[in-house]
């Protein structure tokens, strides 16, 4: 409340007075194969995958005689148990502490028999199931915001003073969250109000992101750092929104007839979320429609070197999650 009152008081003194994810996911967390069609699965970084079942749903509902399961991993190697790979005796695969390098094509071949009870005649059958497993992480959120303030004129030093003061107040408001205001700018325009004369208004725009100096210190105890930074930026967004809402309240309830010549324009606050992906990850709604909002690991043949949202083409990138084009 102190920040809100401070800005209103300074505005008054500055300018005087004016006029007023998988399609085959079961409820139990099991993913079944489909003969002839690879099943796409998305696993959050450092988390555990769902259970990949070496059967289709129809086969799983029937008796299976003498089943043998053979899992092949992304490097065409036969999978065996390890700290990150767990294969049960009924052919179920679980991937733990999922990393970019675990992404890729997994296949399982199910061999089984059909036995005629009357003759004991055996028929051997095989079915192959393909799974495409991708690491993903949540996008990093930032916010683009815009507000307007009335002003007496488009010339003079008061507009710059207001602009610098506003940035300082907003930075102080969210500094404990290690968020900050970046790329601030403003332009002054003359605006014709319906049934009123022209007024001068400052169109202020800025971004808020959760990467103020020292932000990494908040991630020391979390593997999913974007969960921490996204939580902080959401709180920062709410604080800033409440700040401008309070500016409107103060204007309407504390200034009555006489209002500052420079004041917040009610209902002018706008906010838009911007998503960014960490290096090695990107968005592709066409390729990953089941995880369209996710930052999915860049596939071989692509890379992402920065916080962009797309993976760029690179024919010499042969691994998942490439951050450079060799």
Swiss-Prot record:
Q: Which UniProt keywords apply?
A: Cytoplasmic vesicle, Glycoprotein, Secreted, Signal
Q: Which Pfam families match?
A: EGF_Sp38_C (PF20626), Sp38 (PF07354)
Instruction: Give any Gene Ontology cellular component.
Output: acrosomal vesicle
Major subcellular site: secreted
Q: Which positions does UniProt annotate with glycan attachment? A: 86, 220, 256
Disulfide bond positions = none
Q: Which domain of life is it from?
A: Eukaryota
Which GO BP terms sit in this record? acrosome assembly; binding of sperm to zona pellucida; circadian regulation of gene expression; membrane lipid catabolic process; negative regulation of immunoglobulin production; sphingolipid metabolic process
Task: Keyword check for Glycoprotein, yes or no.
Answer: yes
Where in the cell is the protein located?
A: Secreted; Cytoplasmic vesicle, Secretory vesicle, Acrosome
Q: Which residues form the signal peptide?
A: 1-20
- Modification after translation (UniProt): N-glycosylated.
What family does the database annotate?
A: Belongs to the zona pellucida-binding protein Sp38 family.
User: According to its UniProt entry, what is the function of this protein?
Assistant: Is implicated in sperm-oocyte interaction during fertilization.
By what name is this protein known? Zona pellucida-binding protein 2
Q: Write the lineage as a comma-separated list.
A: Eukaryota, Metazoa, Chordata, Craniata, Vertebrata
């Amino acid at each position: 409340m102190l920040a809100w009152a401070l800005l209103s008081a300074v505005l008054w003194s500055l300018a005087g007075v004016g006029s007023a994810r998988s399609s085959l996911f079961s409820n139990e967390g099991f993913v079944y194969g489909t003969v002839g069609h690879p099943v796409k699965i998305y696993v959050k970084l450092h988390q555990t995958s769902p259970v990949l079942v070496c059967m289709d749903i129809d086969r799983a509902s029937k008796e299976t005689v003498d089943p043998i399961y053979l899992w092949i991993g992304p490097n065409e190697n036969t999978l065996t148990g390890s700290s990150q790979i767990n294969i049960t005796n009924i052919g179920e695969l679980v991937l733990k502490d999922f990393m970019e390098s675990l992404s890729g094509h997994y296949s399982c071949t199910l061999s089984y028999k059909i036995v005629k009870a009357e003759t004991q005649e055996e028929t051997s059958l095989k079915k192959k199931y393909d799974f495409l497993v991708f690491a993903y992480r949540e996008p990093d959120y930032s916010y683009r915001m815009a507000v307007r303030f009335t002003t007496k004129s488009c010339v003079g030093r008061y507009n710059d003073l207001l602009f610098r003061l506003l940035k300082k107040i907003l930075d102080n408001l969210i500094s404990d969250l290690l968020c900050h205001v970046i790329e601030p700018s403003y332009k002054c325009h003359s605006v014709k109000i319906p049934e009123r004369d022209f007024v001068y208004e400052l169109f202020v725009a800025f971004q808020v992101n959760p990467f103020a100096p020292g932000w990494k210190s908040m991630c020391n105890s979390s593997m999913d750092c974007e969960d921490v930074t996204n939580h902080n930026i959401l709180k920062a967004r709410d604080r800033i929104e409440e700040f401008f809402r309070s500016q409107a309240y103060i204007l309407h309830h504390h200034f009555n007839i006489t209002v500052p010549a420079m004041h917040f324009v009610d209902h002018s606050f706008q906010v838009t979320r911007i998503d960014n992906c960490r290096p090695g990850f990107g968005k592709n709604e066409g390729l990953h429609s089941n995880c369209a909002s996710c930052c999915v690991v860049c596939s071989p043949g692509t890379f992402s070197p920065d916080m962009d949202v797309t993976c760029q083409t690179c024919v010499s990138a042969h691994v998942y999650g490439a951050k450079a084009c060799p």
